[in-house]
């Protein structure tokens, strides 16, 4: 029997090249060997204020991007979190087995609430909902970046706590952090992760950026002064980041890319890198344009929600029975 993989991405604006190389590209190969659930976590997105129309647009755009990169609805389940009510229901039950202290210790909560007068309660209770997302599908593996590892450890703790107190309902998931590409860094500050939330658009490449924009951003990416195209994360973090992008887009090893640019400067390297990135994103963008306003996209999301609802409902009912919720039914 195939193992189950669950992954959720927030619909908070266009995804970056870092999201693609660090996560989505990996998802395409995962769907061949695993039972995959890819969830657009719109309920997580509203932990911070959202414009209603923009959120709807982002949800649809993210769904189209999932499919455009190669997620196949006949092999994987793609759905929207809020269209499966069991997520919020089990999320509440997970809150009931969580402790305030452990939620306050979450690094992301500390970072996002730091210095703010009014903090949404949902920012604190985000991890129990994330635990529910994962546990509903008897997930074995969760592919995440380093920044989500702490939340995953809490998910495991909550599942074990629930199983011990009530019944063995949940599968304890394993964390999987991809070796390469898990962290593509910012183009203008290699100490920070490439992120669409960075106020400087030159720091990231959006998956929907056109050729001219991509070329411009790569040309303006920071480097160092020695002019040698060599991978050295400690002493040459900026060039090492650009080499990682080249290697992942081209499907070549770092050593092969280094060999290609022996005796050549950063200008030539950046020119070639820009073309490699454009060639990687172009077919994705073409498929995205076909999907974004199509009925096909709605049909796929309807099918995904139906399948996810069937599986999630069964798990929820078992958990409710274990806790003594509702009425006993024959």
From Swiss-Prot:
Motif mapping: 'HIGH' region: 11-19
Reactions accelerated catalytically: tRNA(Trp) + L-tryptophan + ATP = L-tryptophyl-tRNA(Trp) + AMP + diphosphate + H(+)
Coiled coil (UniProt feature): none
Gene Ontology cellular-component terms listed: cytosol
GO biological process terms, semicolon-separated: tryptophanyl-tRNA aminoacylation
Enzyme class, UniProt record, top EC level: ligase
Motif ('KMSKS' region): 193-197
Protein's cellular compartments: Cytoplasm
Keyword tags: Aminoacyl-tRNA synthetase, ATP-binding, Cytoplasm, Ligase, Nucleotide-binding, Protein biosynthesis
UniProt KW Ligase keyword: yes
GO molecular function per UniProt: ATP binding; tryptophan-tRNA ligase activity
Binding-site residues, L-tryptophan: 133
Family: Belongs to the class-I aminoacyl-tRNA synthetase family.
Subunit details: Homodimer.
Function in brief: Catalyzes the attachment of tryptophan to tRNA(Trp).
Designated name of the protein: Tryptophan--tRNA ligase
Gene name as annotated: trpS
């Amino acid at each position: 029997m195939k193992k189950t993989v669950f992954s959720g991405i927030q619909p908070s604006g266009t995804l970056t090249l870092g999201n693609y190389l660090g996560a989505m590209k990996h998802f395409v190969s995962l769907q061949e060997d695993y039972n995959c659930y890819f969830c657009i976590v719109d309920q997580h997105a509203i932990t911070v204020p959202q414009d209603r129309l923009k959120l709807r647009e982002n949800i649809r755009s993210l769904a189209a991007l999932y499919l455009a990169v190669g997620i196949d609805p006949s092999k994987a389940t793609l759905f929207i979190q809020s269209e499966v009510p069991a997520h919020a229901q089990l999320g509440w039950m997970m809150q009931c087995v969580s402790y305030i202290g452990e939620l306050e210790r979450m690094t992301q909560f500390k970072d996002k609430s730091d210095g703010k007068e009014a903090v949404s309660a949902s920012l604190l209770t985000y991890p129990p909902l994330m635990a529910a997302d994962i546990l509903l599908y008897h997930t074995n593996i969760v592919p995440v970046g380093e920044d989500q590892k702490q939340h995953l450890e809490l998910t495991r703790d909550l599942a074990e706590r629930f199983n011990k107190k009530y019944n063995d309902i949940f599968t304890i998931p394993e964390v999987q952090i991809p070796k390469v590409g898990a962290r593509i860094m910012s183009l203008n500050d290699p100490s920070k992760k490439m992120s669409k939330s960075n106020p400087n658009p030159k720091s990231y490449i959006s998956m929907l950026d056109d050729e001219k924009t991509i070329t411009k951003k790569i040309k303006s990416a920071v480097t160092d002064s020695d002019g040698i195209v060599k991978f050295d994360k400690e002493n040459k973090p900026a060039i090492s980041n650009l080499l990682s992008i080249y290697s992942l887009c081209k499907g070549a090893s770092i050593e092969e890319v280094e060999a290609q640019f022996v005796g050549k400067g950063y200008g030539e390297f950046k020119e070639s890198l820009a073309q490699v990135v454009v060639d990687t994103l172009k077919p994705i963008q073409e498929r995205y344009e076909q999907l974004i306003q199509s009925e096909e996209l709605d049909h796929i999301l309807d099918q995904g929600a139906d399948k996810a609802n069937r599986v999630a409902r069964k798990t929820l009912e078992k958990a409710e029975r274990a806790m003594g919720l509702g009425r006993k039914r024959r």
